[in-house]
Amino acid sequence: MLRQWWLRSVGSCSTVYRAHSGCSTSAAVKPKRAIPTDGLQLSDFIKESTKKQRQKAIIPSIEDTKEYLNPEDLQGNGRTVCYVTYGCQMNVSDMEIVRSIMTKYGFVESDKKENADIVLLMTCSIRDGAEKKVWNQLKLIRSNSVNKGQIVGVLGCMAERVRHDLLEKRNLVNIVAGPDSYRDLPRLVAVAAGGSNGINVQLSLDETYADVQPIRVDSASKTAFISIMRGCDNMCTYCVVPFTRGRERSRPIESIVEEVQRLRDQGYKQVTLLGQNVNSYRDMTSMDFSMAPSTSQEDRVPGFKTVYKPKSGGLTFTTLLEKVADAAPDIRFRFTSPHPKDFPMQLIELIASRPNLCKQLHLPAQSGDDETLERMERGYTRDLYLRLVDDIRHVLPSVSLTSDFIAGFCGETEQAHQNTLSLIRAVRYSFCFVFPYSMRGKTRAHHRLTDDVPEDVKARRHLDLTTVFREEALKLNQALIGSEQTVLLEGKSKRDASFSHGRIDGGVKAVFDNSKLCLEPGQYAKILITDANSQTLKAQLIGQSSI
């Protein structure tokens, strides 16, 4: 656009110059070409240049700050850090990595935001409401702080998406660190302590934190998260994740198996494997490709499409799942969040063959309407999705399916909404994560589509989706009454300490009287389901059990 404007201007000026310089010309003098009313003016470029200069002044480069820091400046020396986490399980896992890095440098954890020397917030940008919570929390932290020199840092997706907005509010934020910059936090703290902004939001093509041993939030818990890959290549039009977390890259398979073995030796009983697109995992670092499929087509469900060139070679998610299941047969394994296209039959058959691979699959549909799915660029139709569900249930008859749905996406008609409701009734999910659509900057929807569904309509459709999924979940749970299930104890009931709660293999929460056997969290129990609502099972404890 700039080049086109410059050529128009130069062409006009040169014509006028010839006319006034006495140069002979047979052509008539052309009038200066007018700039379209919807085009860019010179003032637009001046404004943009001024904005970039202001941002450059606010945001120093890494090179500007490295040269005057000594190694001892990076040490915590007992300074306290309060960690605050918002958002998904991936953010919980990321904060465990941050804890490990900061602890290594001599920083000490504190649970008091108002007194801590440093407060680090792990943030989410998936919806506008998630960001508003962080902005409100930042104001509260500053207003309640009794530490005048307190340093506040914003980490994760929001740091990547609204970096400039954060640092322009210097009274609220001192550090901005993107998802691939956590190793740099000690330096960023040192920069902020010196009175400057500390920022690193550079996305990486290879950072996986594979060598960092996380410090987990709840040391008493027997469940853990393991991040196996980062980033996403799917580019769904509504989603900001590819822009805040970058391209897909996977940890070496050996590092994941080793972490599973450590957790096994520490007594953990459930591990959830995490990734933005977890079942597209592909380890390209290992020299052992003997178990890898020869073509990428074997890794995808037939008919499902991608917006990127499919990868081939390496060790796939199916191989990884087989290795971790064999490495820790007493640990239950779950995984999230997957994409429906990455559920080949080899994966489903493996899950069926291993008792410690939970028969609970998250299958994000987002919509049950073909036109809406096309605008979302999900790469499948309603019919393809339903065929996948049928194929899964053929191999795993008792599988528990969960899903994600967006209410009121761009251009969604009332008929499209009804199509989504009918999909929920047809599939019958155990649980659905349902949210009204929130347009995010940088996404393809932001550039190409119109957020044209009124907020009150989004709210009503959101309620419809929630109501229908709960009706179907109630039917599923009531069908379990009278059956025996294996449950992994997670803790005591908040209402009655004599009762314990845990989750069955399908992921549904169960509550039961544990006063006689007094089983501890991390132990397996056999229970008899006696009652149910849409989200919880009531049960009678039969006795201790195993997988």
Curated annotation (Swiss-Prot):
The TRAM domain, residue ranges: 478-543
Q: Which InterPro entries match?
A: Elp3/MiaA/NifB-like_rSAM (IPR006638), Methylthiotransferase (IPR005839), Methylthiotransferase_CS (IPR020612), Methylthiotransferase_N (IPR013848), Methylthiotransferase_N_sf (IPR038135), MiaB_methiolase (IPR006463), rSAM (IPR007197), rSAM_horseshoe (IPR023404)
All copies of the Radical SAM core domain together span 218-475
Q: Which SMART domains match?
A: Elp3
GO MF terms, alphabetically ordered? 4 iron, 4 sulfur cluster binding; metal ion binding; N6-isopentenyladenosine methylthiotransferase activity
Which residues hold [4Fe-4S] cluster 2? Answer: 232, 236, 239
Q: Which UniProt keywords apply?
A: 4Fe-4S, Iron, Iron-sulfur, Metal-binding, S-adenosyl-L-methionine
| List of residues binding [4Fe-4S] cluster 1 | 88, 124, 157
Question: Known Pfam families for this protein?
Answer: Radical_SAM, TRAM, UPF0004
SUPFAM superfamilies per record: Radical SAM enzymes
The reply on keyword Ligase is no
Q: Which ranges does the record mark as transmembrane?
A: none
The protein's required cofactors: [4Fe-4S] cluster
The terms describing its cellular component in GO are: cytosol; mitochondrion
Co-factor: note: Binds 2 [4Fe-4S] clusters. One cluster is coordinated with 3 cysteines and an exchangeable S-adenosyl-L-methionine.
MTTase N-terminal domain location:
79-194
Q: Name one GO biological process term.
A: regulation of cyclin-dependent protein serine/threonine kinase activity
- Which family is annotated? Belongs to the methylthiotransferase family. MiaB subfamily.
The record ties this protein, via PANTHER family, to: CDK5 REGULATORY SUBUNIT-ASSOCIATED PROTEIN 1, MITOCHONDRIAL TRNA METHYLTHIOTRANSFERASE CDK5RAP1
Q: What is its biological role?
A: Potential regulator of CDK5 activity.
- Name of the featured protein: CDK5RAP1-like protein
Which organism encodes this protein? Answer: Caenorhabditis elegans
